[in-house]
Amino acid sequence: MKKTVLRKYAQLIAQTGVNVQPGQEVFIAADLDQPEFVKMLVEECYKRKAKKVVVDWSYQPLQKLHYRYRTMTTLSKLDNYEEARWQHYVDTIPCRIYLLSEDPDGLNGINQEKMAKSQQRLYPTIRKYRDQIENKYQWCIAAVPGAAWAKKLFPGQRTSQAMEKLWEAILSTSRVDEDPVAAWDAHNKDLHDRCQYLNSLHLRQLKYKSANGTDLTVGLIPEGQFCGGGETSLQGIFFNPNIPTEECFTSPMKGQAEGIVYSTKPLSYQGQLIDEFWIRFHEGKAVEWNAKVNNDLLTKLITMDQGSCYLGECALVPFDSPINQSGLLFYNTLFDENACCHLALGMGFADTIRDFQSKTLEECRAMGVNDSMVHEDFMIGSADLSIDGVCQDGKTVPLFRNGTWAF
């Protein structure tokens, strides 16, 4: 891939993604797959006058070894230096960049019970820090190719060819063209206009139906709103949390979901794939489910904590999105969630409450935003999906027909 194109991508992440501010610290989480691109990204952050850029390197095979050999006690606690780093996040509010490149099958064979229990025990410690920085900092999730991930998508290609093809797919769907910043400005306007229309309807329910058996009604929060594209932090800084993104999303009312929904794409979760599954909801709670592939892992996800069996997000994405038109199944939620409509199990978003800036997290949760240690998107969009919105006055408005926008 040409360095000039990769440089545009690095500039897009630093400028349009996290919007690095002069004097701000930047934390980058990345795997070992793309050191040259990470170097380029670090330089772009410094060009925007970042105070300090720290790269937190990871390597998926080591994660697998940690879960194999470490005790539950050491997996379930933060050491003093780790807590100090979280406190540093609270004190300095750095922007954070996450570069995804992991092998979708990289954690196959791991002890799922050990992983789930250690995460459950660790969560209360992390949450006390996470809640203090919620909506205060800029963050951006983007992707770079990893060798195993590329071979998963293009198994018939040599590794170098597969990596090049994955780069092309990432850059194309991320709108890295002649002028990526201008392309994202136009894209953000389109998403914001659609959200504005959805919010003008004052919806109280979404009704999903598809020929695959999906028949689900989800209640919405009266004080809620649809969001999409870039957003503004509590510090007043505009940023784009996902590159790419195609969604208009909201957090539903906890306790108000009735019916059944079928997945339409595999879900990559904890380095493994869950596929061909359905979930039945009653009074908002997942009460029955089954997956043909990795049902035990789906069960671990849904039962992770008290909130993981409730919905945290309803996202509207047209089936003819650029990602779906690519014809690729990415085996990566960042991309696959933006291929079609999806729901999320677990944590909801406080910023989907109107005037959330003037409210506490506890107030947002009391209004109906779900709380959980997990937030996992699963795809439900199809070529025949229809979604109707029910307004507060009982009027029904078509939102989606044949898998795409009806307005």
Model segments located where?
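Dual-mode signal for accessory low-complexity, basic/Gly-rich regions
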Residues: 286-357
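Short polybasic amphipathic segments
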Residues: 205-208, 277, 287, 383-391
